[in-house]
A protein has these predicted regions:
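Glycine-centered short loops/turns at secondary-structure junctions
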Residues: 11-12, 61, 115, 187
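Conserved RecA-like ASCE P-loop NTPase motor core of nucleic-acid helicases/translocases
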Residues: 12-20, 42, 189-195
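Conserved Walker A/P-loop ATP-binding site and its immediately adjacent core
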Residues: 7-33, 50
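Conserved interdomain linker/interface between the two RecA-like ATPase lobes of SF2 helicase motors
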Residues: 105-195
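Motif I (Walker A/P-loop) of helicase-class P-loop NTPases
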Residues: 1-5, 107
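Conserved motor-coupling elements within RecA-like helicase/translocase cores
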Residues: 29-66, 77-80
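SF2 helicase catalytic motif II
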Residues: 57-119
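Flexible beta-alpha connector loops of hexameric P-loop NTPases
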Residues: 39-48, 90-101, 162-170
């Protein structure tokens, strides 16, 4: 929000991409509270006439922030300064219908045209984005503490190939088995999310 506020102060506009239309209302509410009626939405729930009106408002500079899924990238802003892609790892950013495109790659190209910046936000970045950050193509910013002040969890990376070479044929690494056993011995619960 701070970066968007800075762009607006410079007379530039921002696009905020969200992966699901269902997230539009809660996201719009947060932005509307901060930026007022110069925030709008662009998504498939709008009629063709409403989409046209939003595009005309954007071209006329009456909108500072547009919120929506990947199609919001095509909003014709006169002075786009920032594209924020929330949860950039989500598959919904990939268009499966013609024309096929990935919103991340499209956002980068649109940003080049306008001289704009792109922020890819994610607690679990895609491998592509993380790889590019590791190569220095993107700048990686990491949260070192939570907004609420709580501690960040400890993360372990385990090479299951090495575990297999050492005779562990389980789908669980020895480290995970150790941590689950520890929690269960303390009377605590463990939840496994399988992707």
């Amino acid at each position: 929000m701070r970066l968007i506020g800075e762009m607006i102060a410079r007379g530039r506009q921002a696009i905020v991409l969200i992966p699901e239309i269902a997230l539009t209302y809660q996201t719009l509410l947060r932005f509307y509270q901060r930026f007022g009626d110069r925030v709008s939405v662009m998504n498939s729930t709008l009629s063709p006439g409403e989409k046209y009106d939003q595009c005309e408002r954007a071209k006329a500079g009456e909108i500072d922030v547009i919120i929506g899924p990947r199609s919001a990238l095509f909003t014709p802003f006169p002075s786009l300064g920032l594209i924020v892609m929330d949860e950039e790892q989500e598959n919904s950013y990939k268009s499966e219908s013609t024309p096929k495109y990935h919103a991340r790659e499209t956002a980068l190209e649109v940003a080049k045209l306008y001289g704009a910046s792109v922020v890819l936000g994610s607690a679990t970045p895609s491998l592509e984005a993380y790889y590019r950050a590791g190569r220095g193509e993107y700048r990686l910013l990491q949260l070192t503490k939570r907004l609420t002040g709580g501690e960040l969890p400890t993360v372990y990376t385990v090479d299951l190939r090495q575990e297999l070479q050492e005779g562990n044929r389980s789908i669980f690494s020895r480290k995970l088995q150790e941590l689950m056993t520890d929690r269960l011995n303390k009377g605590q619960q463990t939840i496994l999310f399988l992707n």
